[in-house]
């Protein structure tokens, strides 16, 4: 039996955030917020975009190990934007995904499209961090949070001018959706086992509010799946590994988009 990766990641994250708070207090972070430029709307970008592709920058994952250890945001991020990505997702978890907040800081001045901080957010401290490095949106994972905590973090994110992508992977988590949620992501990967099944998006789509901006995450390796998902009401398609495992992720995205048209 594969052990629950999510609980291991969350335990490590609590430890990490505690250490970060010792180094830089939340008050110090709050002071740094004033000079941060205003956010771009990821929700608008997805609702109005032709592609809806949220191209992901990640070096590794718990299920695959290293995908591209030496990957540089300076090269890959602008190539994603040039190829036609609607938004970017940048993994900032170091231990399990090989990323850092520096990756967003580096990427921000290089592109005009919105950036999602993808991490395991459990504390408002991480929302301040996201804002300071230039993220426009944050991921909140239902499986990692109690509904009340999720609600509280979504409210705080909005106070800071960050949009919220709520990630769910089962109908039990539909209770997490309320008006503070800007986008709803359906994760096709079970976070306990990291097994992927795109049909999960189709199963849940019909149970979601009509006005929700829907995003399908993980396991999208084929342009034809994007067409099917779009027909089912999805507006955003989060794709990482399919691009990152190739020599030129931006070029792979470009070809992928041509195949969708």
What are these regions (language model features)?
Residues 12, 58-60, 93, 120, ...:
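Active-site beta-loop-alpha junctions enriched in small/polar residues
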Residues 129-149, 186-195, 234-253:
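Glycine-rich phosphate-binding active-site loops on the catalytic face of alpha/beta enzymes
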Residues 57, 64-165, 171-176, 201-204:
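N-terminal active-site wall of soluble small-molecule enzyme domains
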Residues 3-68:
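An N-cap/entry alpha-helix motif that binds or orients negatively charged groups
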């Amino acid at each position: 039996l594969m052990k629950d990766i999510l609980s291991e990641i969350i335990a490590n994250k609590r430890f990490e955030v505690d250490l970060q708070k010792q180094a830089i207090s939340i008050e110090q972070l709050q002071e740094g917020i004033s000079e941060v430029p205003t956010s771009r709307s990821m929700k608008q970008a997805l609702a109005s975009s032709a592609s809806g592709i949220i191209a992901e920058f990640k070096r590794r994952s718990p299920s695959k190990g290293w995908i591209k250890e030496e990957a540089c945001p300076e090269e890959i991020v602008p190539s994603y934007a040039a190829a036609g990505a609607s938004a970017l997702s940048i993994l900032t978890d170091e231990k399990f995904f090989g990323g850092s907040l520096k990756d967003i800081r580096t990427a921000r001045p290089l592109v005009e499209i919105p950036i999602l901080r993808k991490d395991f957010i459990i504390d408002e401290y991480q929302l301040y961090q996201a804002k300071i490095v230039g993220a426009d949106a944050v991921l909140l994972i239902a499986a990692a949070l109690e509904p009340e905590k999720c609600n509280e973090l979504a409210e705080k994110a909005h106070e800071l001018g960050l949009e919220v992508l709520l990630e769910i992977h089962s109908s039990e988590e539909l209770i997490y959706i309320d008006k503070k949620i800007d986008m709803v992501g359906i994760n096709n990967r079970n976070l306990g086992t990291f097994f992927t099944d795109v049909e999960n998006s189709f199963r849940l789509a019909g149970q979601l509010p009509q006005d929700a901006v829907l995003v399908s995450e993980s396991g999208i390796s084929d342009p034809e799946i994007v067409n099917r998902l779009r027909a089912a009401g999805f507006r955003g398609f989060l794709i990482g590994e399919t691009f990152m495992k190739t020599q030129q992720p931006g070029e792979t995205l470009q070809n992928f988009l041509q195949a969708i048209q």
